[in-house]
């Protein structure tokens, strides 16, 4: 991307036309899907090194949603897309097991809570709490040899429309109360503490 942090690249060789016959094509697609899923799992496993403290139950595991760039990134971060794809694979595996018994009209999937995602800078949120519980200043701009880059965060939050106030989808409101709410997560970002130390 445009002056952004480097992400690991995924490369495949050949294309579907180079495969011979339907059986070979099926084997090739299965092999490619297995390889892609294996790479995704390895990347996601590496991201689950940092654990939040037990007191902060709203905190998720560490996820990479930070990018340094000279302009607003045009796409979501790669690891976010990989997480979404893995969730899709998990849901697909589950639906394949129950597909025979399900009504065709009910096979579509909807999120329990509607959400929106966008890139934001430290201009919107100037302070944060680090993993030791200290309040730190989030750096909006980072100096580099040829100028400066902005630090962008890919923020996902509950949608202000729809089910956020009415409760979660799929919950029987006659018996249960539910609520969609945005939770906090830890990310690796450039910050400054009260002693002006940057890290």
Swiss-Prot record:
InterPro entries tied to this protein: Brain-der_neurotrophic_factor (IPR020430), Cystine-knot_cytokine (IPR029034), Nerve_growth_factor-like (IPR020408), Nerve_growth_factor-rel (IPR002072), Nerve_growth_factor_CS (IPR019846)
One Gene Ontology term, aspect cellular component: extracellular space
One GO BP: negative regulation of neuron apoptotic process
Propeptide: 1-100
Locations listed in the record: Secreted
Entry keyword annotation includes Glycoprotein: yes
Polar residues composition-biased segments: 12-23
Entry keywords, A to Z: Cleavage on pair of basic residues, Disulfide bond, Glycoprotein, Growth factor, Secreted
Coiled-coil intervals, chain numbering: none
Residues bearing attached sugar chains per UniProt: 93
Transmembrane intervals: none
Top-level taxon: Eukaryota
Region called Disordered, residue ranges: 1-23
An example molecular function term from Gene Ontology annotations: nerve growth factor receptor binding
Main localization of the protein described in the UniProt heading: secreted
Disulfide bonds: 113-180
Keyword Cell inner membrane assigned: no
Family, as annotated: Belongs to the NGF-beta family.
Function per UniProt: Promotes the survival of neuronal populations that are all located either in the central nervous system or directly connected to it.
PANTHER family: BRAIN-DERIVED NEUROTROPHIC FACTOR (PTHR11589:SF3), NERVE GROWTH FACTOR NGF -RELATED (PTHR11589)
Protein name in UniProt: Neurotrophic factor BDNF precursor form
Organism: Morelia spilota
